[in-house]
Structures are given as C-alpha cells and as structure tokens.
C-alpha cells in the first residue's frame, strides 16, 4: 500500500515537472506548422531595389552595383544580369 502511494505521487510529480518544462520551452513559438513554414519562406526571400532605384549599399540592388555618387542602382555590366544570375 505504501509503495503504491509512493509510485502514484512520483508519477504525478514527474508529470507536473514535464508539463512545466514543456510550457517554458514552447513560449514564443507558433503552434501551427503551416505558419512556421511561411515564416521561414518570408525570411528567405530577399527584396532588392531595381535599376534606377535608390540605394545606400550594393547589397540592396538587384543589379550588381550601387553608384555611390548618385545613390542609384545601376547595371554596370550593361547586359541586364541580376545578382541571382551571377
């Protein structure tokens, strides 16, 4: 009888500990897998500025060059290749 009570209390204690730790680890995470996959897709897509658009750094331009004088994206190769092709 004492052993049964000890086992029941131990199981309840371990279950409570497991639920408490599972709750703290899941904070800030989304519950639905579909939402998680769309968040990853949004983070992976990179928006860039087309030719003749304003820029401050070369990485912002879809083309290969940001003119530091005019702060405009230009295709310095003159053949219309974007970064994804290069």
UniProtKB/Swiss-Prot annotation:
Tissue and organ distribution: Expressed by the venom duct.
The species this protein was found in: Conus striatus
GO function terms (MF aspect): ion channel inhibitor activity; toxin activity
Compartment(s) where it occurs, according to its Swiss-Prot or TrEMBL record: Secreted
N-terminal signal peptide: 1-22
Entry remark concerning the domains of this protein: The presence of a 'disulfide through disulfide knot' structurally defines this protein as a knottin.
Recorded family membership: Belongs to the conotoxin O1 superfamily.
InterPro entries per record: Conotoxin
GO CC terms of this entry: extracellular region
Domain of life: Eukaryota
Protein name per UniProt: Conotoxin S6.10
Broad class of the protein's primary localization: secreted
Pfam families xref list: Conotoxin (PF02950)
Entry keyword set: Cleavage on pair of basic residues, Disulfide bond, Knottin, Secreted, Signal, Toxin
Propeptide residue intervals: 23-45
Cysteine disulfide links: 48-62, 55-66, 61-73
